[in-house]
Amino acid sequence: MPQNLTASNSETKLSVLITGGSGLIGRHLTSKLLDSGYKVSHLSRTGAKQGQIRVFKWSPDIEFIDPEALDGVDFIVHLAGANIGEKKWSKKRKLEIIESRVNSTKFLHEVVSKRGIILKAFISASATGFYGTSASTKIFNENDLPGNDYLGLVCKQWEEASDLFNNSGIRTVKIRNGIVLEKTDSALSKLMMPAKYGFLVKTGNGLQYMPWIHIIDLCNIYLEAIKESDMSGSFNATAPQSVTHAEFIKVLGRVMKKPVFPIPVPAFVLKTVLGEMADVVLKGNQVSSEKLMNTGFKFLYPNLEDALDNIING
């Protein structure tokens, strides 16, 4: 029977080291892990203390890491990476997005290998962008090949770097995050912004799919990846209810009690403003969460309206 690695199973707390711990997912996951009885520390480029969390400085670009950072660590959760939606995708920025993920993963593996650290698991973020940003009606699962666009390339190279841990005999889990729903610092907060003018807006033709997930469910998936010793490989972290952008905005309007402006933001406007990055908004895939649910995972928020109501009105 597979071992369930809950923090309470041991006399000493199991230790989780998180990269990107100050980001959206990292903050929520840290709280979840602490509440679940784990010891949590962060790797940060600044090394600035974050409440009760011990923070170790690292700088993968110059291959520096605090020598004490990995002492006694049982799990690494790797979330760090340059924000995909923060800046326009110049050639330089696109390189930063890839290198911040791939090189940091390779550096972590090098340090773990050289020091002979025995991890219980290495858990890395990825994204449903692995499948590319096509406008097809295909439902993608973990057996599908990566997309041939930029986001597909980013995720492919990131996951290949993560597989270095698997090749070293360390249980490796790659979590392909969907669009994370959270009120203050997520894609949802941007979609809600027009509401201050009294309405919501659609973008493009509205037919693009939005593989979404509530932040609570996403943190629970990462917790499962830590606890369940037979969980390995890639998993799509998206809610089972598949919706288009137009459907999403309609439900959001209903929850917020705001009308949807009848004229969408034209695709050419977004392409002019955002360049290639507009594809993230204008295209999207249907993504299956069947493999995850087959592990026994139960979503707390499988329904979009319930998820939005909890986040906005809860």
Go through each PLM region and give its residues.
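C-terminal amphipathic/interface module of NAD(P)-dependent oxidoreductases
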Residues: 1-10, 14, 279-314
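Mid/C-terminal beta-alpha module of Rossmann-like enzyme folds, strongest
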Residues: 10, 228-276, 309-314
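Alpha-helical substrate-binding/gating segment
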Residues: 192-200, 208-242
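N-terminal Rossmann NAD(P)H-binding glycine-rich loop of SDR-like oxidoreductase domains
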Residues: 14-36
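Glycine/proline-rich active-site loop of Rossmann-fold NAD(P)-dependent oxidoreductases
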Residues: 156, 168-170, 180-190, 225-235
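NAD(P)H-binding glycine-rich loop region in Rossmannoid oxidoreductase-like domains
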Residues: 56-104
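Conserved beta-loop-beta element that borders a ligand/cofactor-binding pocket
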Residues: 126, 160-183
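Conserved Rossmann-fold NAD(P)-dependent oxidoreductase catalytic core, especially the SDR/UDP-sugar
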Residues: 106-149
